């Protein structure tokens, strides 16, 4: 069973929980709820995966890459319009979900796509795109907040519509 390391921190915007690999790849990012709730959700999400979650504070040895990723993620949450080079590792998702998430990563900051546009591009239905967005476990880095309803309508967001609206506004998108 491989170890993954998690950390919880506050930004100017919200509380964030990150799970990272030894080499600093973000494999889980959750935000917006109190730390105790974020930890509970994380434990449930990882319950069927073959990883042992450990607090980052218990890690010994070189944490340089992890620390860099954490700092970059803090900056990204506070200023999502400024691109950060943060590597991710997908531990969750079906092949279809991962295909959708790879398309989401191509949407630049400051732009949105509708569920229908993505569905047409991938040859599926809008509802499927919505379900894939809802299954995303890496907030902000897999930018499901950039997917909106028809007529640019603000729709649901796993971490709360208020955070979706905040992220879009910070990227210069008025919804």
UniProtKB/Swiss-Prot annotation:
Subcellular location: Nucleus
A single MF term (Gene Ontology): DNA binding
Catalyzed chemical reaction(s): a 6-O-methyl-2'-deoxyguanosine in DNA + L-cysteinyl-[protein] = S-methyl-L-cysteinyl-[protein] + a 2'-deoxyguanosine in DNA; a 4-O-methyl-thymidine in DNA + L-cysteinyl-[protein] = a thymidine in DNA + S-methyl-L-cysteinyl-[protein]
Signal peptide (residue range): none
Transmembrane region(s): none
GO BP term, pick one: methylation
Pfam families: DNA_binding_1
Residues annotated for DNA binding in this entry: 115, 127
Keywords: DNA damage, DNA repair, DNA-binding, Methyltransferase, Nucleus, Transferase
Active site per database record: 144
Residue pairs linked by disulfide bridges in the UniProt entry: none
The protein's enzyme class: transferase
CDD domains found in the cross-reference section: ATase
GO CC annotation, single: nucleus
DNA damage in keyword set: yes
InterPro entries found in the cross-reference section: MethylDNA_cys_MeTrfase_AS, MethylDNA_cys_MeTrfase_DNA-bd, MethylDNA_cys_MeTrfase_DNAb, WH-like_DNA-bd_sf
Chief site of localization: nucleus
Superkingdom, natural source: Eukaryota
E.C. code: 2.1.1.63
Protein family membership: Belongs to the MGMT family.
Further facts: This enzyme catalyzes only one turnover and therefore is not strictly catalytic. According to one definition, an enzyme is a biocatalyst that acts repeatedly and over many reaction cycles.
Function (record text): Involved in the cellular defense against the biological effects of O6-methylguanine (O6-MeG) and O4-methylthymine (O4-MeT) in DNA. Repairs the methylated nucleobase in DNA by stoichiometrically transferring the methyl group to a cysteine residue in the enzyme. This is a suicide reaction: the enzyme is irreversibly inactivated.
UniProt cross-references to PANTHER family, sorted A to Z: METHYLATED-DNA--PROTEIN-CYSTEINE METHYLTRANSFERASE
Protein name: Methylated-DNA--protein-cysteine methyltransferase
């Amino acid at each position: 069973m491989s170890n993954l390391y998690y950390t919880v921190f506050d930004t100017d915007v919200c509380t964030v929980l990150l799970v990272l690999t030894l080499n600093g790849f973000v494999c889980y990012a959750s935000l917006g709820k109190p730390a105790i709730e974020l930890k509970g959700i994380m434990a449930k999400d990882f319950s069927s995966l073959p990883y042992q979650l450990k607090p980052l504070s218990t890690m010994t040895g070189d944490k340089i890459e992890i620390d860099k990723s954490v700092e970059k993620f803090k900056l990204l949450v506070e200023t999502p319009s400024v691109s950060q080079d943060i590597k991710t590792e997908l531990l969750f998702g079906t092949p279809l979900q991962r295909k959708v998430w790879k398309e989401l990563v191509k949407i630049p900051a400051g732009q949105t796509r509708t569920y229908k546009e993505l569905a047409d591009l991938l040859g599926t239905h809008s509802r499927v795109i919505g379900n894939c967005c809802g299954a995303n476990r890496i907030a902000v880095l897999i930018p499901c907040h950039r997917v909106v309803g028809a007529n640019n309508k603000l729709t649901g967001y796993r971490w709360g519509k208020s955070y979706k609206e905040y992220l879009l506004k910070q990227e210069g998108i008025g919804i």
